[in-house]
Amino acid sequence: MASQGTKRSYEQMETDGERQNATEIRASVGKMIDGIGRFYIQMCTELKLSDYEGRLIQNSLTIERMVLSAFDERRNRYLEEHPSAGKDPKKTGGPIYKRVDGKWMRELVLYDKEEIRRIWRQANNGDDATRGLTHMMIWHSNLNDTTYQRTRALVRTGMDPRMCSLMQGSTLPRRSGAAGAAVKGVGTMVMELIRMIKRGINDRNFWRGENGRKTRGAYERMCNILKGKFQTAAQRAMMDQVRESRNPGNAEIEDLIFLARSALILRGSVAHKSCLPACVYGPAVASGYNFEKEGYSLVGIDPFKLLQNSQVYSLIRPNENPAHKSQLVWMACNSAAFEDLRLLSFIRGTKVSPRGKLSTRGVQIASNENMDTMESSTLELRSRYWAIRTRSGGNTNQQRASAGQISVQPAFSVQRNLPFDKSTIMAAFTGNTEGRTSDMRAEIIRMMEGAKPEEVSFRGRGVFELSDEKATNPIVPSFDMSNEGSYFFGDNAEEYDN
């Protein structure tokens, strides 16, 4: 990609952007993982969790959420100023599950946010360790991406629910920084911008005054983030138009939706990182593993090796299939919600099925669910091969795709053709090429028309045996091309709504 040299790698984003060499980056990411692990161990001690209970993914999610809430300054300020009945703004908590007399019990715990912040800082050598917090946010985001299809959110902003492959990171909080921005899909950025423009249309003062200046700054920053994800000059030029608009309105919304559609074929660069639950890092640190000394990368073999040697458990509802629950979490751990299922099946070594075929609901258990019938089982998170995560969209290519999802967003840098349903996508581009962006629109449509089905992406890249740590022998997988490639096919996924 042409601008690769000017972009910071996402390890640099993880490490506040100093230019570092690979060893320093690995140590720095390792230090972040150590901090999460130490914090988790301490929380398990505070909560008096057994080893098994500490490896329960539902407990991990509650503990992660508590620390994220303790450090959410804007929300904390908001809660102080708008006290609501029954919510103590200084406290945070959630459900903790314990095994009592052969049954799973739910216990609601409550802690001072100040106390949680103290434990977190202590585990991170006195630092706020924002990177560790962002890491947990991205893990939650990846889990949401795998569990829910954002149909309603897409429709609300005027987009087509079949564009779900563009929605990576759509539930990431705004405060997730540069590392968060790197993993957001094109559709996510478009949705954030459209929401902003709609507020401006409905509220005359949105862009005015001191606040309006800040808002405008945020708008232009978001436009630049989105522009940086596009890989063609015409798409970028259109983003300049949207950014420079005096008074963003419906024309800009149209342009953004056009760009989002175009990204189904002319895919943007979206980073992928394997962010694992805290209950994976905790036991590894407890066993004496020193991530900072050994070094760690979110985009190489390390997360695969860690998952090969981890025991993670999950609560299972009466009519859920534990193997399906495992697939859900495995995909989330590998940031692969929108990847081609044929490739995922190859890497995992077992068949990866579309979301609608899985007999499993989300990982979290609602407070009104009956605990008497809950069982627990081991999550199978191991893989047959490993592959390098990508931060490019690959180049384009066409293949029959499904009703539920009409394109993919690659997560792994592995040679294959990238399926997308060209006729369905192109049908959306009827006629509308007038107006100030007409030449760019025409150019974009021309490039999309030219996308060839036989084109191969990531040429020469393969997957690797788990013993091949230095990635010396790439294995290029071969696929049955007639097979279904998309995860949200047909779509029975539940809706994600906060």
Curated annotation (Swiss-Prot):
Q: Which UniProt keywords apply?
A: Capsid protein, Helical capsid protein, Host nucleus, Host-virus interaction, Ribonucleoprotein, RNA-binding, Viral nucleoprotein, Viral penetration into host nucleus, Virion, Virus entry into host cell
Q: Which residues form the signal peptide?
A: none
Q: Which SUPFAM superfamilies match?
A: flu NP-like
Q: Where is this motif: Bipartite nuclear localization signal?
A: 198-216
Instruction: Give the molecular function GO annotations.
Output: RNA binding; structural molecule activity
Motif Unconventional nuclear localization signal: residue span?
Answer: 1-18
How is it modified post-translationally?
Answer: Late in virus-infected cells, may be cleaved from a 56-kDa protein to a 53-kDa protein by a cellular caspase. This cleavage might be a marker for the onset of apoptosis in infected cells or have a specific function in virus host interaction.
Region feature Disordered, mapped onto this chain: 1-21
Quote the subcellular location field of this record.
Virion; Host nucleus
Q: Which domain of life is it from?
A: Viruses
Q: Which family does it belong to?
A: Belongs to the influenza viruses nucleoprotein family.
The UniProt function text for this chain reads:
Encapsidates the negative strand viral RNA, protecting it from nucleases. The encapsidated genomic RNA is termed the ribonucleoprotein (RNP) and serves as template for transcription and replication. The RNP needs to be localized in the host nucleus to start an infectious cycle, but is too large to diffuse through the nuclear pore complex. NP comprises at least 2 nuclear localization signals that are responsible for the active RNP import into the nucleus through cellular importin alpha/beta pathway.
Q: What is this protein called?
A: Nucleoprotein
Question: What would be the name of the gene that encodes this protein?
Answer: NP
